């Protein structure tokens, strides 16, 4: 990528981040971002496929920091139960802190893009390793189901409409996904 194109892309991300923080992700359109920057829509879409794509890049630095700390959990805690409990607390807090951006990413036109992202793969690998069993198909299924239950929309629904506390949500996930063997590792 040319230097000026790289600078334009960075400027777009910075202005989008600023507008999202000030007015909320859901209140800012791609058109508004282009107008704020004084660029055409073509320029904006040359860098980002859609708003979901832009949101993913806006939050990318935070995702990288999150993953670094997330991986450290396995070094700091030893039982599967502790690792899962602490990792869920950390992940759920990240979802609360970044709800609007994550909802935008997950609601994008290309539903598979999120599941093919490096962030999803890191989460998958983390929990797959935690659930590892002789049945690889079952382990993959279990990991995918956990991550689906951790999607921003499912989490928000449970908290906002079912009125489940965050701690209860975490504990329910621990009960569902860690069998007695996993609790005593």
UniProtKB/Swiss-Prot annotation:
GO molecular function term, any single one: DNA-binding transcription factor activity
Residues covered by the HTH tetR-type domain: 6-66
DNA-binding listed as a keyword: yes
Superkingdom, taxonomy of origin: Bacteria
Record flagged with keyword DNA-binding: yes
Pfam families: TetR_N
DNA-binding region residue numbers: 29-48
Name of the protein this chain belongs to: HTH-type transcriptional regulator SAOUHSC_02897
Record's keyword terms, sorted: DNA-binding, Transcription, Transcription regulation
One cellular component term from this protein's GO annotations in UniProt: protein-DNA complex
Species name: Staphylococcus aureus (strain NCTC 8325 / PS 47)
């Amino acid at each position: 990528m040319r230097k000026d194109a790289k600078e334009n892309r960075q400027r777009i991300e910075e202005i989008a981040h600023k507008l999202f923080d000030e007015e909320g992700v859901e209140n800012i359109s791609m058109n508004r971002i282009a107008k704020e920057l004084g660029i055409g829509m073509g320029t904006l879409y040359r860098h980002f496929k859609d708003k979901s794509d832009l949101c993913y890049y806006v939050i990318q630095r935070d995702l990288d920091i999150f993953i670094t700390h997330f991986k450290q959990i396995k070094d700091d805690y030893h039982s599967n139960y502790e690792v899962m409990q602490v990792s869920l607390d950390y992940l759920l807090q990240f979802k609360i802190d970044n709800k609007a951006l994550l909802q935008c990413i997950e609601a994008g036109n290309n539903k598979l893009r999120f599941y093919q992202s490096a962030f999803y793969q890191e989460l998958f690998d983390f929990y797959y390793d935690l659930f590892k069993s002789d049945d690889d198909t079952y382990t993959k299924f279990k990991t995918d189901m956990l991550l689906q239950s951790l999607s921003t929309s499912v989490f928000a629904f449970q908290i906002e409409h079912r009125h489940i506390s965050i701690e209860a949500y975490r504990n329910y996930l621990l009960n569902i996904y860690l069998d007695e063997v996993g609790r005593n590792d």
